[in-house]
């Protein structure tokens, strides 16, 4: 993936993280509080139990912010269309869209279902899903 796409994806994720901070939270957190952990299989935990894996792509690494009630998954080898289909499937499973934004290089969405909030940022070949458990 070229540098421009990575920058667009990183910027979109940062915006989504900032927007998610607008809702009331008891636990402060920083996106830099965790190091990436390389994985090759879907992790089983309280966070990933709230969603399902995408049909396409491969999980690449995770960030464990569980002390702050958050967990991030990074995927590779999926098209922007695959990622959009995943967002649509999450909506069909009952997640409501709070907001979304897209441009030529990347897109993102904030979804919520009960006490689970999702921040999803994606571009060609990559997607990041941040899961937050609220309360």
Please report, for each region that a protein language model flagged, where it lies by residue.
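An acidic-aromatic pocket/loop used at catalytic or ligand-binding sites
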Residues: 23-135
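Classic N-terminal secretory signal peptides
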Residues: 12-16
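C-terminal motif of bacterial Sec signal peptides marking the signal peptidase cleavage site
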Residues: 17-21
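N-terminal hydrophobic targeting signals that begin at the initiator methionine
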Residues: 1-2, 23
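Bacterial N-terminal signal peptides that target proteins for export
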Residues: 2-10
């Amino acid at each position: 993936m070229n540098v421009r796409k990575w920058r667009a994806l990183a910027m979109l994720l940062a915006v989504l993280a900032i927007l998610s901070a607008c809702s009331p939270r008891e636990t402060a957190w920083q996106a830099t509080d965790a190091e990436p952990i390389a994985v090759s299989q879907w992790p089983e935990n309280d966070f990933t139990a709230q969603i399902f894996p995408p049909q396409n792509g491969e999980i690449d690494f995770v960030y464990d912010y569980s002390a702050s009630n958050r967990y991030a998954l990074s995927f590779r080898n999926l098209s922007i269309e695959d990622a959009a289909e995943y967002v649509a499937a999450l909506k069909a499973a009952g997640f409501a869209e709070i907001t979304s934004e897209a441009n030529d290089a990347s897109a993102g969405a904030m979804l919520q279902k009960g006490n689970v909030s999702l921040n999803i940022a994606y571009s060609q070949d990559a997607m990041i899903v941040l899961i937050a458990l609220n309360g």
